[in-house]
Amino acid sequence: MNISDVAKKTGLTSKAIRFYEEKKLVTPPVRTDNGYRSYTAKHIEELTLLRQARQVGFTLDECRELLALFHNPARHSADVKAATLLKVAEIEQHINDLNQMRMRLLALAEECPGDEGADCPIINSLAGCCHSSSSLPLK
């Protein structure tokens, strides 16, 4: 299979496939006599794993670990589960952080009159100005 066939089968761009090869995340494809890359079903599996792992938030280094587990016939599913649950915990923390940011922004917006005046509690609070009418804590 050539790179455009692999791109179609995996949902990745040719550029992304070459990037993953450059980062040594996939098994290097064999080169044909004319220098073109030749891919196998194993490459499709590796690249599909990479695409889907990236879609759910795994970093490139975490993907490297998942690929090592994928290639290890003696792997333990407990290792894969542990990596997955660790990623879930990171995502939950990120969600909590985003919710706190959202609540702070809503509180700032509530204090702002939103009129034609120049005084803006949002700007004052974000800038840490002491003359802000906002009593919201700075973070």
Curated annotation (Swiss-Prot):
HTH merR-type domain sequence ranges: 1-69
Span of the signal peptide: none
Localization: Cytoplasm
One term under GO cellular component: cytoplasm
Primary residence: cytoplasm
Quaternary organization: Homodimer.
Keyword Isomerase: no
Job description of the protein: Regulates the transcription of the copA and cueO genes. It detects cytoplasmic copper stress and activates transcription in response to increasing copper concentrations.
Pfam families, sorted: MerR_1 (PF13411)
Chain sites annotated for binding Cu(+): 112, 120
Source taxon at top rank: Bacteria
GO biological process, one term: positive regulation of DNA-templated transcription
Protein name: HTH-type transcriptional regulator CueR
Domain notes: It contains a N-terminal DNA binding region and a C-terminal metal binding region.
DNA-binding region coordinates: 4-23
Record key words, sorted: Activator, Copper, Cytoplasm, DNA-binding, Metal-binding, Transcription, Transcription regulation
One of the record's GO molecular function terms: DNA-binding transcription factor activity
